């Protein structure tokens, strides 16, 4: 026993002998870091606790570390009700005494808040040499060059201005990036409400480009987008969840609460740089990469990946995931096609071509496509439902399918139910309801795979709606109070008031104006979707494509191609 005890003490003694810094010195170096010190100034010293542990394995330290490192954490707690938890964490190089990592506030719990290069969409689309050309082409094709100070040009700039907040996000500056999202959201909301209430298109000069030119450019850009997706894009957890759900459904398993997890399951893969092993043997005997929270979306978010899964399959690992890339590309192209059809039907050749071009050239649609999320699936059903807006049945089906992908589009259900108004006969409303119910029943039929539908429905609620409602997130203004930091207000009450106003607004626009044109339907749909995003606790730049089709339709609808002179 004495020999065993001595053997266990040898590695610890060896590690201690190789340390250049003491625990106290490593902690002091971390606390003196400018970024850390600025954040800690927001907290009283009372209740603050610092700790540091030595890590001898350089592979678990920051890249480039030659020896060991110190993992330092700072927590703060005032009482049982006011507990900020870990408020700062990072690493100190033991040999160089350099702070190699310093994460504060939202960066502690959210790695996506740390500004890792290319974390969303890959490195190319996030680089200025790709992003700025998309912005330039978008303006070149749609701007009113005859009137540089026109309202239409301001609208286009507002759409592109989300780029500023995204730039700060990509550099890990959450407390700057998030507030910068709201001015363009509020502006576009106001513009959509104004157009939707007045029912008049935006006055604009004759377009610079012919429909054929815009359409040819759009086809070229779409081809370029597809190549860029295949060559340099990544798949985040959202897209990965889609193919997992498709595999579960194809195997006769309800996806909810059956996603790959780690827990204490047998490992079947290597550990990452943080020592975490994601690949585990799951309940089905397969070695799969964990994504335990991926079952938080509606059933359509998984059913939409079935064709891609059947064609390209899934290895079980979080690898290149070709089925996800295929699905993203298909829905990206479908969005462009649907917009073209809607524009052609309601506004003519120029509007149809312009909408396809707008979708193709807008950098945020490519950003979502190259992140390979399910955010292209959300608008596609509404786009085609809008194209077939004269059919109550089609409107009901489209709202249900979109809302059962991610739940936000359900906010437009009253508006689409009463379109075009006024409601005089029950038949159109019944047709809408029938389409909605049929689509809902078909979408939720996967709950029957469980064998206990009632329990499956409860599981669905627990994993989706309850999770979404109770989640915490720094990616909006509404939940920053969780940090209990000086100078950061608690806006939960404001959020609740805005939520009530949104619901009230959704009911009001269902009946006011009494009759609505396709332009008003598009504008008010865009307004409601923007309103929903304004009050979200967890917001992302990936959500911009939800409202973009309807906003850009409303903003470009007034442009008319000049008729050719008769000979």
Which residues fall in each region the model found?
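Hydrophobic secretory-pathway targeting helix
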Residues: 1-17, 214-224
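Short, non-transmembrane alpha-helical segments in secretory-pathway proteins
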Residues: 16-63, 122-130
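Exposed beta-strand-loop-beta-strand "reactive/processing" segments of non-cytosolic proteins
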Residues: 40-95
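Short, aromatic-rich amphipathic segments at membrane interfaces
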Residues: 94, 98-128, 313-316
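Membrane-helix interface and helix-disruption motif detector
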Residues: 121-125, 145-153, 168-180
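Juxtamembrane interface at the cytosolic side of transmembrane helices
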Residues: 133-161
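Primarily membrane-embedded glycan-assembly and transfer machineries that use lipid-linked glycans
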Residues: 157-211, 224-386, 393, 420-541, ...
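Transmembrane-embedded, aromatic-rich helix segments that form part
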Residues: 396-402, 408-419, 543-546
